[in-house]
Design a protein with these regions (language model features):
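Charged, amphipathic alpha-helical coiled-coil/dimerization segments
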Residues: 67-125
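C-terminal regulatory/oligomerization modules of transcriptional regulators
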Residues: 120-144
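Key DNA-contact positions within bacterial/archaeal DNA-binding proteins
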Residues: 60
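Short alpha-helical "packing" element that flanks the helix-turn-helix/winged-helix DNA-binding module
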Residues: 31-35
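Alpha-helical residues within the helix-turn-helix
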Residues: 23, 53, 70-71
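N-terminal leader segment of winged-helix/HTH proteins
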Residues: 1-25, 144
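Short, locally clustered residues in the helix-turn-helix/winged-helix DNA-binding domain
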Residues: 36-41, 103, 131
């Protein structure tokens, strides 16, 4: 029963967050997740493979996602001068502006749909409980 409730709650909240982000800012949750990673990265640039790992996407999945962000002018692709096999994604000035606008409303939506349902002690307890679940390798430093 707990598993079913967890899955349904996750699906419902994710669906609402995604719909709001797309309607207000033209971003998917996956787009937003990539922008969060870049926003928190030193100089707002990361290796594409590191972004893929952080957002739990395959190499082809991150390529498709970054291609869309590049076409929108939010992110730019940069080559590694010392290794042609390595490429980077960097947050553009326009991407930074648009991300910051999306961030404000997205965090407010998270608070409305999730945070306001629990007091501080319950959120801490929930974080501790969910922390027991196995997670894929990812950086905790860039999560919002």
């Amino acid at each position: 029963m707990a598993w079913i409730r967890f899955l349904r709650a996750h699906a419902a909240v994710t669906r609402q967050l995604s719909a709001r982000l797309e309607a207000e800012h033209g971003l998917t949750l996956s787009d937003y997740d990539v922008l969060v990673q870049l926003y928190h990265a030193p100089d707002r640039i990361l290796r594409r493979v590191d972004i893929a790992r952080a957002v739990l996407l395959t190499a082809s999945g991150i390529t498709r996602l970054l291609d869309g962000l590049e076409r929108g002018g939010w992110v730019e692709k940069r080559a590694c001068k010392s290794d042609a096999r390595v490429s980077y994604a960097a947050l553009t000035t326009e991407g930074l502006k648009r991300f910051e606008a999306a961030r404000r409303s997205h965090l407010a939506d998270i608070e409305e749909l999730f945070g306001s349902r629990f007091d501080a002690d319950e959120r801490a307890q929930l974080a501790e409980l969910l922390g027991r679940l196995p997670l894929a390798e990812t950086s905790e430093a860039c999560s919002e």
